[in-house]
Amino acid sequence: MGKEDGFRTQKRVSTASSAAAGVLPTTMASGGVRRPPPRGRQIQKTFNNVKMTILCGFVTILVLRGTIGINFGTSDADVVNQNIIEETNRLLAEIRSDSDPTDSNEPPDSDLDLNMTYTLGPKITNWDQKRKLWLTQNPDFPSFINGKAKVLLLTGSPPKPCDNPIGDHYLLKSVKNKIDYCRIHGIEIVYNMAHLDKELAGYWAKLPMIRRLMLSHPEIEWIWWMDSDALFTDMVFEIPLSRYENHNLVIHGYPDLLFDQKSWIALNTGSFLFRNCQWSLDLLDAWAPMGPKGPIREEAGKILTANLKGRPAFEADDQSALIYLLLSQKETWMEKVFVENQYYLHGFWEGLVDKYEEMMEKYHPGLGDERWPFITHFVGCKPCGSYADYAVERCLKSMERAFNFADNQVLKLYGFGHRGLLSPKIKRIRNETTFPLKFVDRFDIRRTTPLKIEARS
């Protein structure tokens, strides 16, 4: 048929005859001379055929998996991935529980005797003299540098992961905010994630840590506790420590609410300062006995609710216990307590976060009061927990605004700022120059002179 008639197909011959003839079965022109294809091309063709076979097999497997079911022919990789997920979930469940598989030989916690007074540790006496001697013997560790008291900021969070992933993200933002402030103002910082005393968990965990830091760092003059849900929002403002020369505890509050109304919110323990001295150790010893979890804390809660105005019925918390202690033993303690309200050592978030734009328009950082709050405290939000007193979305948006409001003050030195108080993205706010030092002189917070706090009537 046409040109095809000029071709014929040779039959396969036996191996012996083929070898004898020196030919392979092929298609060739009738009567023509056989010209075998180049060896390289033949190998390439064979290789292509193998690749096509493998590809077809792979496609077939995919079709079968999609048709019969996703679990058909589960690969080893799928099994490994599933095992990783299960192991991760198991570890998270273990971490969130109170049990520790490594503590199998540890005896269970015994209930504390309600008739015994709980203590934080051995009674420390003459601490002021011992500390003074230590400072004299260790001149390389002064408690004052250039006339400025050495301060250590203590904060922290529970040792377990948050109940929701976004909570861990905001804990990270919170500690970043605190690190920025401490770096700018030459303050040391300790982030604690350990419960040093099993009996004092939750709100009370700060007490044993404060005591331990005092005794382990005699060179520190002030220990400053700050909750993880509190953010610095005035990065320029500095606490006027010289104002507290004759006091050992500085805490935000209102004397009228404390003494006249005996309110359970007269003081706030989300941010306060303790001087490293014998008086502070004695106050911690007097404060702690209401804290042990279980029957002691529950019974103490009933006493606090009965004696403090507006307090709901729940177990004893550290804030209510301190207020009750200062009221019931006023003559013993109040002389050395400074109840501060001239600036926001604690600023309740609800009345502040929606006014940040107005503050930026009218005022400037460094004021520390309602015009530009020093600290914005998200009381009741509990970003790390599974419940809160306020809507989660409202809390998270407000925390984002507070963080970015403060972060803009830090980024300004570098020529950047957030696109908006709800945006994590940043934008350039000025062009770079060949004379960068003029911006250091102008925008470096460390070169800002702190404003003097004037007493208000």
Swiss-Prot record:
Location (main, coarse): Golgi
Disordered, as annotated region: 1-40
Transmembrane segment boundaries: 52-71
Keyword terms, alphabetized: Glycoprotein, Glycosyltransferase, Golgi apparatus, Membrane, Signal-anchor, Transferase, Transmembrane, Transmembrane helix
Alphabetical list of InterPro entries matching this protein: Glyco_trans_34 (IPR008630), Nucleotide-diphossugar_trans (IPR029044)
GO BP terms, alphabetized: xyloglucan metabolic process
Membrane topology: Single-pass type II membrane protein
Annotated Gene3D superfamilies: Spore Coat Polysaccharide Biosynthesis Protein SpsA, Chain A
Cytoplasmic side: 1-51
Pfam families: Glyco_transf_34
Any one GO CC term of the record: Golgi membrane
Localization terms from the record: Golgi apparatus membrane
Lumenal side: 72-457
The enzyme's E.C. designation: 2.4.2.39, 2.4.-.-
Catalytic activity: Transfers an alpha-D-xylosyl residue from UDP-D-xylose to a glucose residue in xyloglucan, forming an alpha-(1->6)-D-xylosyl-D-glucose linkage
GO molecular function: xyloglucan 6-xylosyltransferase activity
Residues of this chain annotated as glycosylated in UniProt: 115, 431
Family classification: Belongs to the glycosyltransferase 34 family.
General function of this protein: Probable xyloglucan xylosyltransferase involved in the biosynthesis of xyloglucan.
Protein's recorded name: Probable xyloglucan 6-xylosyltransferase 3
Protein source organism: Arabidopsis thaliana
Organism ancestry: Eukaryota, Viridiplantae, Streptophyta, Embryophyta, Tracheophyta
Gene name for this UniProt entry: XXT3
